[in-house]
């Protein structure tokens, strides 16, 4: 820590009335670009308009102006998010069976959409229980609402209106901070102040206020709900806040107020700030008292973290000092210069944030099922499957985005003349070693992981089960994973004081938790089948990383095209007369990386879906016998490629294929339609631009003959545009197909 004299007095950090508000300007398509604003000559214009509308770098090179546009756009984004949230709460208030679900969450399915009777579409309104007919939803909103203490549709209305007000406020803020009071560049670059405010304000006070809400509102209301009290009889939230006696009846230590806190007798509060571990047997979710405790602890950590960085008072850490001190014996200049990169290149900053947020999103996916945070979430299999799948896809897209913006940084913002022997320079100088080794790892993983399956398929085909890799023949047990599981299962009592169960039931050791005769969670066994598919995961992830990292490290130059940086982020080929130089731009690496990201995530969600149906989800009889949805067939069936096709894809597709004439028929239509969208993508991906240009010229000739030719000349999509359209439809079609397949299946059997 460095003590310095205080900074000078607070500087004026905004420009007033920086840019006038002009609807005429906004009404002109392409007003941000001189060429596009001229209007269309050819149909390429509309594609350029879409490509460049949000590429603020192409509008101006002034970093301050770019920063202001990004900042303003963030408020617009927040406005849309609040609008979306408001819509969700409004549907809960107006069209849902929330109050009925609240009274019997184990037998009634959540629904918040009722289809109007137009051309027979009302067939989609299935019976979700309790006499309500509607579409079963799998977003988890009902479970969140219950956990936060919402007991009536009126409360949902109020929240929806509140979110609308916030949406309007955000829209106003976006306009205000660009047109009326636009921050100066120095404000955007003041990282210490930003860290303090984000850590202490957003994360610290945010967590503290949520912990406060949980203790004073959610916990008492959920206590009543768990005891079977009718939601209409439960006191309203403000009564708990205003009347301490009410809370003291449920949690006696409330009667003592803050005395235990100041006398350091904190264990008094353990009844509502608990440390149980495991799941609440009534709801199958984490103990809400554990969650409140967690948020209080997080709040304290972040409130401390938000006071660590040096701003106006000359005391605390400086980010620049930290980064420049960060060097080891073999790392040259270390992180020297990184501070300048991250305060002048928003692409570099965004790339780091996307990589971390993407990884975090995938961590969330894995915790939502292993430590289900909301009441009755674990027994709602459709929601569990949807939440896992959703967070996996989002994480995958964010990580590809990280590589995209890292490459844009390399092309547009990286200045090789000022960088020498820092870590980034050193990585770039030995990029050949990195990429060739990574390539070797991909080849090794690919042949060996796939080879294990091919061996099993061959042995199975030849009728030699005793020679297969399986739990009953040649075992390949995941011993390290089992060791980690076991360590965690034995941890309670040896690590955290007072913890009665391990963090997750999935580790083993504990009994199963079932709610209303349905399994919430139980110890998940790992065997040869998991070992095999795990190595497929390793293979697909390494290939994705290979493609993306190669795109970043070779974004500026390569042996093939030494002057690649001059060609920009996306270009089709290195000009005429240089064969074999197509598909080398940084953009093309992102394009190719998306396909492998899709491969990776598909295998993960297939693994999850089948494993959970086979070994976890199911019903519990009165005698205590568990019957799993697919009867534990994962261990023996998933060890061959044929098993995946026959017992997972084909066997479980029967629900979506046979959905016509039932309330699930929309999924059947989506399954079909999404396959079409996917197939449509191939037309863009497998076809050349010249083919289409020739076809267009014939069609234009016919239009001219009939004197109906448009003024705007039709043009075939450029190579890059065609690829962008192709990959979009490929991913959209693939994801929607998977969505229909998963939901029709799990709603029918779950």
UniProtKB/Swiss-Prot annotation:
**Residues at which [4Fe-4S] cluster binds:** 573, 582
Q: Where in the cell is it found?
A: Plastid, Chloroplast thylakoid membrane
Keywords tagged on the record: 4Fe-4S, Chlorophyll, Chloroplast, Chromophore, Electron transport, Iron, Iron-sulfur, Magnesium, Membrane, Metal-binding, Oxidoreductase, Photosynthesis, Photosystem I, Plastid, Thylakoid, Transmembrane, Transmembrane helix, Transport
Annotated residues that bind phylloquinone are located at: 692
Instruction: Cite the binding residues for chlorophyll a'.
Output: 675
Please list the reactions this protein catalyses.
Answer: reduced [plastocyanin] + hnu + oxidized [2Fe-2S]-[ferredoxin] = oxidized [plastocyanin] + reduced [2Fe-2S]-[ferredoxin]
Details of cofactor binding: P700 is a chlorophyll a/chlorophyll a' dimer, A0 is one or more chlorophyll a, A1 is one or both phylloquinones and FX is a shared 4Fe-4S iron-sulfur center.
Biological process annotations from GO: photosynthesis
Known EC number(s)?
A: 1.97.1.12
Q: Where does chlorophyll a bind?
A: 683, 691
Q: How does it sit in the membrane?
A: Multi-pass membrane protein
Quaternary state and interactors:
The PsaA/B heterodimer binds the P700 chlorophyll special pair and subsequent electron acceptors. PSI consists of a core antenna complex that captures photons, and an electron transfer chain that converts photonic excitation into a charge separation. The eukaryotic PSI reaction center is composed of at least 11 subunits.
Q: What does the protein in this record do?
A: PsaA and PsaB bind P700, the primary electron donor of photosystem I (PSI), as well as the electron acceptors A0, A1 and FX. PSI is a plastocyanin-ferredoxin oxidoreductase, converting photonic excitation into a charge separation, which transfers an electron from the donor P700 chlorophyll pair to the spectroscopically characterized acceptors A0, A1, FX, FA and FB in turn. Oxidized P700 is reduced on the lumenal side of the thylakoid membrane by plastocyanin.
Q: What is this protein called?
A: Photosystem I P700 chlorophyll a apoprotein A1
């Amino acid at each position: 820590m460095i003590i310095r004299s205080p900074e000078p007095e607070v500087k004026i950090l905004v420009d007033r009335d920086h840019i006038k508000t002009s609807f005429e300007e906004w009404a002109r398509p392409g007003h941000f670009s001189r060429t596009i604003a001229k209007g269309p000559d050819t149909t390429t214009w509309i594609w350029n308009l879409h490509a460049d509308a949000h590429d603020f770098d192409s509008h101006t090179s002034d970093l301050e102006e770019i920063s202001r546009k990004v900042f303003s756009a963030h408020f617009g984004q927040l406005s849309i998010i609040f609008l979306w949230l408001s819509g969700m709460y409004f549907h809960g208030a107006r069209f849902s069976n929330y109050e009925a679900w609240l009274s019997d969450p184990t037998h009634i399915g959540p629904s918040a959409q009722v289809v109007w009777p137009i051309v027979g579409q009302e067939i989609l309104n299935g019976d979700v229980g309790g006499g309500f007919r509607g579409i079963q939803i799998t977003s988890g909103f009902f479970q969140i609402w219950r956990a936060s203490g919402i007991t009536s549709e009126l409360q949902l209305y109020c929240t929806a209106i509140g979110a609308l007000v916030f949406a309007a406020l955000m829209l106003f803020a976006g306009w205000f901070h660009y047109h009326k009071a636009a921050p100066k560049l120095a404000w955007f670059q003041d990282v210490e102040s930003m860290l303090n405010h984000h850590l202490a304000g957003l994360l610290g006070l945010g967590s503290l206020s949520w912990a406060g809400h949980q203790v004073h509102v959610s916990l008492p209301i959920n206590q009543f709900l768990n005891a079977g009290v009718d939601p209409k009889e439960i006191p309203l939230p403000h009564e708990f806040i205003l009347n301490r006696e009410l809370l003291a009846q449920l949690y006696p230590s409330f009667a003592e107020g803050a005395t235990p806190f100041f006398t350091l007798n904190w264990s008094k509060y353990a009844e509502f700030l608990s440390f149980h571990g495991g799941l609440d047997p009534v709801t199958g979710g984490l103990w809400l008292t554990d969650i409140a405790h967690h948020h209080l602890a997080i709040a304290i950590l972040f409130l401390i973290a938000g006071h660590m960085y040096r701003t106006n008072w000359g005391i605390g850490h400086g980010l620049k000092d930290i980064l420049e001190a960060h060097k080891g014996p073999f790392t040259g200049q270390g992180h020297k210069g990184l501070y300048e990169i991250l305060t002048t290149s928003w692409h570099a900053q965004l790339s780091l944030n996307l990589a971390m947020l993407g990884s975090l999103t995938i961590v969330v996916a894995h915790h939502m099922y292993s430590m289900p945070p909301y009441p009755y979430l674990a027994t709602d299999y459709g929601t569990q499957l949807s939440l896992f799948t959703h967070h996996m896809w989002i994480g995958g897209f964010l990580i590809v985005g990280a590589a995209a913006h890292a490459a844009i940084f390399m092309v547009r913002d990286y200045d090789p003349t000022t960088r020498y022997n820092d870590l980034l320079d050193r990585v770039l100088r030995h990029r050949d070693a990195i990429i060739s080794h990574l390539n070797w790892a991909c080849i090794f993983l690919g042949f060996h992981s796939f080879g294990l399956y091919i061996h099993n398929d061959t042995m199975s085909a030849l009728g030699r089960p005793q020679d297969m890799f399986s739990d009953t023949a040649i075992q390949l047990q995941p011993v390290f994973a089992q060791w980690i599981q076991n360590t965690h299962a034995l941890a309670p009592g040896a690590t955290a004081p007072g913890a009665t169960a391990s963090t997750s039931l999935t580790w083993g050791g504990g009994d199963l938790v079932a709610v209303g005769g349905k399994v919430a969670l139980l110890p998940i066994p790992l065997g040869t089948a998991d070992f095999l598919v795990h190595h497929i995961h390793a293979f697909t992830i390494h290939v994705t990383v290979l493609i993306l990292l190669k795109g970043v490290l070779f974004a500026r130059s390569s042996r093939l095209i030494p002057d690649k940086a001059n060609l920009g982020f996306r270009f089709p080929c290195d000009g005429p007369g240089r064969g074999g130089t197509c598909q080398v731009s940084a953009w093309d690496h992102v394009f190719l990386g998306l396909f492998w990201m899709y491969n990776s995530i598909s295998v993960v969600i297939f693994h999850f879906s089948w494993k959970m149906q086979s070994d976890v989800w199911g019903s519990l009889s009165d005698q205590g016998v568990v019957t799993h949805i697919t009867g534990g067939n994962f261990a023996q069936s998933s060890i061959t490629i044929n098993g995946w096709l026959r017992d997972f894809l084909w066997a479980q597709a029967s629900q979506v294929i046979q959905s016509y004439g039932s309330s699930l028929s929309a999924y059947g239509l989506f399954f079909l339609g999404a396959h079409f969208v996917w197939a449509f993508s191939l037309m863009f991906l497998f076809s050349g631009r010249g083919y289409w240009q020739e076809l267009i010229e014939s069609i234009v000739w016919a239009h001219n003959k009939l004197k109906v030719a448009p003024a705007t000349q039709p043009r075939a999509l450029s190579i890059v545009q065609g690829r962008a359209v192709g990959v979009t439809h490929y991913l959209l079609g693939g994801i929607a197909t998977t969505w229909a397949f998963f939901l029709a299946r799990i709603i029918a059997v779950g």
